[in-house]
Amino acid sequence: MPKDKWEQPIQPPPPLFLGEKERDLVKQVNDELIERVIGQQVLYYPISAEYTNYHPVYGEAINKNFLSPVRVYALIEWDGIETTTANYGLDKKYSMTVHFHKRRLTEDQDLYVREGDFVLYDDDYYEIVTLKEPREIFGQAGKSIEISAHCIKSRRGNFDAE
């Protein structure tokens, strides 16, 4: 085969400017932007897996025990109020989406967001009902940058941290 003929490489070349240093730079910029410029924060109440009595078959717990709250800087997206009519009158559901910086939580604060945990925002408690990881850094598979938690306001008496 002649030397001047092009051959298809077996693997694509590694990314030129998208390595570990660039991901660290993005983390540093996001940390500074979220904490020092935007400054929105929530108190995160993680469930204590050690002291909560889970059902052996269903994996659910009637009474949950929580660890001490952790202050977390995040981006808060207010979803608004949804009003529905039920048999007994109107029902209002307040919801918001909390966008957590994944590497800041897992690497620096050793915190893992889970469904069923609670957050305190603006003197109201919200329960995390769904989680998503919608964005990847530079489009690289397995390198998500954000955890989005959809939260619904908890009714009085359902959760009380005091």
Placement of each model-derived feature along the sequence:
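N-terminal disorder-to-order initiation segments that are Gly/Lys/Arg-biased
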Residues: 1-93, 97, 101, 137, ...
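Mixed-charge, Lys/Arg-rich low-complexity intrinsically disordered regions
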Residues: 102-108
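Short, well-ordered loop/turn sites that connect or cap secondary structure elements
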Residues: 110-113, 120
